A protein has these predicted regions:
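SAM cofactor-binding core of SAM-dependent methyltransferases
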Residues: 1-25
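A short acidic (Asp/Glu
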Residues: 1-3, 44, 126-131
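Hydrophobic/aromatic-lined pockets within catalytic cores
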Residues: 7, 42, 46, 166
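Short, flexible loop/turn elements at secondary-structure junctions
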Residues: 17-20, 36, 123, 221
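A short SAM/SAH-binding and catalytic strip from SAM-dependent methyltransferases
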Residues: 19-20, 27-50, 91-97, 101, ...
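A mobile, often basic/glycine-rich helix-loop segment
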Residues: 31-80, 132-142
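Long, Lys/Arg- and hydrophobic-enriched amphipathic alpha-helices
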Residues: 77-223
Length: 223
């Protein structure tokens, strides 16, 4: 993967294992951009029952894969962290400590000025149900129907992002609004069929209006 990027890139590309491995000058303005990155970060799923969260796990019984519930040691921590929600039995919560660690790393960057923006499939309030998507060749699959050459992804909790960076006054906008708010009028008012087709494509209207749930989250730090 790295070799392919280096061969095709016309500019110098550096790969880092940790964000702190990148040498940042305090006088630099850092731009952090990602597209469909955070939805690839694995989340654990928890189900609420009788005042506590149980972790949803995969088990095998008689050669068949099944979902089971197991005691979650962090149940109390989850209830506290998401205390603005009143959970009911069978509500599903998706939570990732890895995601929290990445956000903490970004928040603790030592540079005085940086701009952060990311675009991903997500939500601004907990859906209280599973958002796990399994795709193969751009087609949705059912859980356990296929195990090779598949992509697993979770919808991104942008409410968590917003709370994490609340002091930076973050902005959340869906892709459809982002396109229509920033595209020059000459294109928006165009009657050219090809132009209209491209606008429908990039705004998400072509794909079941996915542009409404494909969100952009941005903020800047300027000290």
């Amino acid at each position: 993967f790295r070799k392919k990027i280096l061969e095709n890139s016309k500019v110098k590309v550096n790969f880092i294992e940790n964000i702190y491995d990148y040498n940042i000058d305090n006088e630099d303005i850092l731009f952090i951009y990602s597209n469909e990155f955070f939805d690839a970060i694995g989340s654990k799923q928890f189900i609420f029952n009788n005042g506590n969260f149980n972790e949803i796990k995969i088990s095998k019984n008689n050669n068949e894969y099944i979902l089971i519930q197991d005691i979650a040691p962090i149940s109390g921590e989850l209830i506290e962290n998401y205390s603005n929600y009143k959970f009911e039995n069978n509500d599903v919560l998706e939570h990732s400590n890895l995601l929290l660690n990445i956000l903490s790393d970004i928040k603790n960057l030592s540079c005085k000025k940086y701009f952060f923006t990311t675009t991903d499939y997500g939500y601004t309030s907990l859906p209280l149900k599973s958002s796990l998507r399994i795709l193969s060749n751009h087609k949705k699959l059912n859980l356990f129907s296929k195990f090779e050459n598949v992509d697993y992804s979770f919808a991104v909790n942008f409410e968590l992002f917003s709370n994490f960076f609340i002091k930076n006054n973050p902005l959340i906008i869906n892709q459809k609004k982002l396109i229509f708010n920033n595209l020059p009028n000459e294109f928006l008012k165009s009657s050219d069929k090809n132009v209209r087709k491209i606008i429908d494509l990039i705004s998400g209207e072509t794909f079941d209006d996915i542009g409404k749930v494909f969100l952009n989250f941005s903020f800047k730090k300027n000290e």
